[in-house]
Design a protein with these regions (language model features):
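Electropositive phosphate-/nucleotide-binding environments in soluble metabolic enzymes
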Residues: 2, 45-49, 79, 162, ...
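Short secondary-structure boundary/capping segments
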Residues: 25-26, 86, 119, 128
Length: 219
């Protein structure tokens, strides 16, 4: 893929100054899923408190929580991240992580399947491990599903992880089976990689048919 460069000035950014008081927490009980990211947890103490408030409301209301570890070495150390993750992950329904991020969480250099089981032991119902060009796998109900990455003319991989999450959660909310969720997530991430920028390539459900295969099928 072509090399891209992203400049993100986190210090003093709007995201770093968010507080729990800024959140419309009344929206959470009416939501079908709450998606959180480790970047928000890492930005500042106030943004971490905001995440905690949202998570607490979702837990009380019985709203499923999705959490992507999204580790960024520029924001905090692996030890700091692991400590925070271990307070959040047990309260989540779905956890997304790359192999490297999963190893930070569990503290062991395990393979993807082993990492999924280790994370599931912490409490989440579903664990999804993203492994870039090698594909992805999920552990749901004690069963492992794996889907290979699609061969595409990659232009820019920035945003592929978020696109993957969006595709997976879309499948979950539409009632797709675990493997179909992974297939949908893989297709959405592929679209993200075929254009510059982190959101510009986001597909509609109609767009997904252009890649062929079972991505638009809810089983």
């Amino acid at each position: 893929p072509h090399r891209g460069r992203v400049l993100y000035y986190r210090s003093g950014s709007a995201g770093s100054t968010i507080t729990a008081a800024m959140l419309d927490l009344d929206l959470i009980p009416r939501s079908r899923v709450l998606h959180l990211t480790g970047i928000t947890v890492a930005l500042s103490a106030s943004s971490r408190d905001a995440v905690e408030s949202a998570l607490s409301v979702a837990s009380i209301a019985g709203v499923p929580v999705s959490f992507d570890l999204n580790y960024r070495a520029a924001l905090w150390s692996e030890l700091e991240a692991r400590t925070a993750y271990r307070l959040i992950v047990p309260r989540c329904t779905v956890v997304f992580a790359s192999v490297a991020e999963a190893r930070i969480l569990v503290g062991k250099p395990l393979a993807a399947v082993e990492l999924a089981y280790e994370i599931a032991n912490l409490g989440p119902t579903e664990v999804v491990i993203k492994d870039g060009g090698r594909g992805s796998l999920s552990l749901v109900g004690g069963k492992i599903e794996s889907v290979p990455a699609l061969e595409i003319p990659a232009v820019d991989t920035v945003g592929a992880g978020d696109a993957f999450d969006a595709g997976y959660l879309s499948g979950l909310l539409r009632g797709a089976e675990p493997r179909a969720r992974l297939e949908l997530a893989t297709a959405v991430a592929a679209f993200a990689c075929m254009s510059s920028g982190d959101w510009e390539g986001s597909p509609t459900h109609a767009d997904l048919a252009l890649l062929g295969g079972p991505h638009d099928v809810v089983r």
